[in-house]
């Protein structure tokens, strides 16, 4: 679950400096901020006015952040919910095999994959 904010009066946009002071009043802001429950900014994307936002990517990032906050994994390029994850390098391989009972595949000593832990 995550809240989505609409900023009809531009108060949040002004607070975070999202609008250039010389911009037109009617120009939409195409910025996305993901702020976690601890009020920490985790992602900021600003799109050109000519480019629409990619909501599939935004949802993918939220899924990744929620997963990696709860498990010692990272998500690789083009990862989708349900795909294998990367075991973080700080966990030794023996400990990783114990921590991830679904299995750990060692592609390289520095690259170990495991099925998504919360599936």
Question: What is the predicted role of each segment?
Answer:
Residues 1-119:
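Chalcogenol-based redox active-site neighborhoods
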